[in-house]
């Protein structure tokens, strides 16, 4: 839509807004929220151009970036498709003496931190001739720049210096979260758009993390909460399988829990695992094979798998059970299986599980990334731990994210989750590009969206730290069971298969095992028994 940048006489505000609405036909809604105009039909091309831009920005020599110096900006009219063409042309110019249309801005205008003075966030021009919004942005050194954005002409600035922008990007994310907490949505809306523009100048993990957090903030600001449906559960299962293949976190979770279960079942003739996190049953082939190799022959193995309903009432738990039954037959393990569909673990009752006397059958209860989902419903976690207590298992294995994303204070959980997922995405950067990696990032992005955009019962990604779980389990009548040094050594060997083990770290903490990236623990495996007290 062409606009006159010089004459604003007597244009009706309502008419202008209608014109903008008409102009948005065919535009992607979520990107529009972030301030980008991208037609749905252009999405594939835009994605390809972004990928080309990332490759060129990472490969180009520093000297060749002189035209994109720190003092330089690209003016972005929010038409992302056109802007990408412009950036690609600038980074790969014609051989002729082409001039770059880059505008310099004074150093004082380069902001170190985003904050918006809400008192001057909206100011209508006198006489009604021009509809303007004055926004005052402050930087940490006290320098102030006032920008005036008219409804007739809005020009967004995208700075290209990646390192300095990274600092600004983090400041903008935190400032936006603070504005959301204070319910200052005018400020939050302005900042979330700035985040979108700053994120484009980043490469690698930083850009991906910022984009997911920007989406989550936008959803919270505009109340576009992601839905929770059976289809979402099915999608999450699929994404989790890609995550399992891409990086060692789920493999570590399964391996360490299995080691604790294997040790608890030593010498038992009949064993029963109750899995709170059945999903696709990825954890159990390895345990079954270990049981098959046990001296003196394998025990009778009974598995009870619990999972959420599937779309179209598809019985995926039965299908998983059939696959495991075929494996059991091949490795000569006597196998029994039963699947339970439950909307929530809080619907379970011990009487449903056909428990047998402990002298006949030994039981293990297993939960991987499930218990935190109960924390949004009053009394749910206490009920489930009460059921586990009634089961009287030999061992209760639990794997949870090692981070507190369940603070009642929004800014606290936002800050914690920003650090946590930045580390996780950073650990994925060494993974070769491919479908598994992309789907793993989507898997984590959905978690980010839930932590930031949702509240009440819809917010299920309520991760807590091992120390918080330790207190909760202690109050419910459980005592920690030490996970042996054998598991520690073998887990360390497992990590060597990923990126040569570089960057990953296994730590022992009071009998529990943690897997982290560099100095940051990310997931924790713990084992519990009924307290003798």
Swiss-Prot record:
Induction and repression of expression: Upon seed imbibition, increased GA levels in the epidermis reduce DELLA proteins (e.g. GAI/RGA2, RGA/RGA1/GRS and RGL2/SCL19) abundance and release, in turn, ATML1 and PDF2 which activate LIP1 expression, thus enhancing germination potential.
GO cellular component: nucleus
Localization terms from the record: Nucleus
Pfam families recorded: DELLA (PF12041), GRAS (PF03514)
Key word Transcription regulation present: yes
Subunit comment: Interacts directly with the GID2/SLY1 component of the SCF(GID2) complex. Interacts (via N-terminus) with GID1A, GID1B and GID1B (via N-terminus). Interacts with the BOI proteins BOI, BRG1, BRG2, BRG3 and NUP58. Interacts with TOPP4. Interacts with TCP14 and TCP15. Interacts with FLZ5. Binds to and coactivates GAF1/IDD2 and ENY/IDD1 at the promoter of GA20OX2 gene. Binds to PDF2 and ATML1. Interacts with the prefoldin alpha subunits PFD3 and PFD5 in the nucleus.
Keywords per UniProt: Activator, Developmental protein, Gibberellin signaling pathway, Nucleus, Phosphoprotein, Repressor, Transcription, Transcription regulation, Ubl conjugation
Lineage, broadest ranks: Eukaryota, Viridiplantae, Streptophyta, Embryophyta, Tracheophyta
Modulation of this protein's activity: Transcription activation is repressed by gibberellic acid GA(3) in the presence of TPR4.
Name of the gene encoding the protein in the UniProt record: GAI
Region (PFYRE): 363-450
Region of interest (VHIID), residue spans: 240-305
Motif LxCxE motif, chain ranges: 174-178
Motif (VHIID): 271-275
Protein name: DELLA protein GAI
Residue ranges of every copy of the GRAS domain listed in the record: 160-529
Keyword Phosphoprotein: yes
Main location: nucleus
Species assigned in the record: Arabidopsis thaliana
Ranges of biased composition (kind: Basic residues): 1-12
Motif DELLA motif, chain ranges: 28-32
Motif (LXXLL motif): 371-375
Residue span of region Leucine repeat II (LRII): 319-351
Residues spanned by motif LEXLE motif: 50-54
Annotated segments matching region Disordered: 1-24
């Amino acid at each position: 839509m062409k606009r006159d940048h010089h004459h604003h006489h007597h244009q009706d505000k309502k008419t202008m807004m209608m014109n903008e609405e008409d102009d948005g036909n065919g535009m992607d809604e979520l990107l529009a929220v972030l301030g980008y105009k991208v037609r749905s039909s252009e999405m594939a091309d835009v994605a390809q151009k972004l990928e080309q831009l990332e490759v060129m920005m990472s490969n180009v020599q520093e000297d060749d970036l002189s035209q994109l110096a720190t003092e330089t900006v690209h003016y972005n009219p929010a038409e992302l498709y056109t802007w990408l063409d412009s950036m690609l042309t600038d980074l790969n110019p014609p051989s002729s003496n082409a001039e770059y249309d880059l505008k310099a801005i004074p150093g004082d205008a380069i902001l170190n931190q985003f904050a918006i003075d809400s008192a001057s966030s909206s100011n209508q021009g006198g006489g009604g001739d021009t509809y303007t919004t004055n926004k005052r942005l402050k930087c940490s050194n006290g320098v102030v720049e006032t920008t005036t954005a008219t409804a007739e002409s809005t020009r967004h600035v995208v700075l290209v210096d990646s390192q300095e922008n990274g600092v600004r990007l983090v400041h903008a994310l935190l400032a936006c979260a603070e504005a959301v907490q204070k319910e200052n949505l005018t400020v939050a809306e302005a900042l979330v758009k700035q985040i979108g523009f700053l994120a484009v100048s980043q490469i690698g993990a930083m850009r991906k993390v910022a984009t997911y957090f920007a989406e989550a903030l936008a959803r919270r600001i505009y109340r576009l909460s992601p839905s929770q449906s059976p289809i979402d559960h099915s999608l999450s299962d699929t994404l989790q399988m890609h995550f399992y293949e891409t990086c060692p976190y789920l493999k570590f979770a399964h391996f360490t829990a299995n080691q604790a279960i294997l040790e608890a079942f030593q010498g038992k003739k009949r064993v029963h695992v109750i899995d709170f996190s059945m999903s696709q049953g990825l954890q159990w082939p390895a345990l079954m094979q270990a049981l098959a190799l046990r001296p003196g022959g394998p025990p009778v193995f009974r598995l009870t798998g619990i999972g959420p309903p599937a779309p179209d009432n598809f019985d995926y738990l039965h299908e998983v059970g059939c696959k495991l039954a075929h494996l059991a037959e091949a490795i000569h393990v006597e196998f029994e299986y039963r699947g339970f569909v439950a909307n929530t673990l809080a619907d379970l009752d011990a009487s449903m599980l056909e428990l047998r006397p402990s002298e006949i059958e030994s039981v293990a209860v297993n939960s991987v990334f499930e218990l935190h989902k109960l924390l949004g419903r009053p009394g749910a976690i206490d009920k489930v731990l009460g059921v586990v207590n009634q089961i009287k298992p030999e061992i209760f294995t639990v794997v949870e994210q090692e981070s507190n994303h369940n603070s009642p204070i929004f800014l606290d959980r936002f800050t914690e989750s920003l650090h946590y997922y930045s580390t996780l995405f950073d650990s994925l950067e060494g993974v070769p590009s491919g479908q598994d990696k992309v789907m793993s990032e989507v898997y984590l992005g959905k978690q980010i969206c839930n932590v930031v955009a949702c509240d009440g019962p819809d917010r299920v990604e309520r991760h807590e730290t091992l120390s918080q779980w330790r207190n909760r389990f202690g109050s419910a009548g459980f005592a920690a069971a030490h996970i042996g040094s054998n598991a520690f050594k073998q887990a360390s060997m497992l990590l060597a298969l990923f990126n040569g083990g570089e960057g990953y770290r296994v730590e022992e903490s009071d009998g529990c095992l943690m897997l982290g990236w560099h100095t940051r623990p990310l997931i924790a495996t713990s084992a519990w028994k009924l307290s003798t007290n």
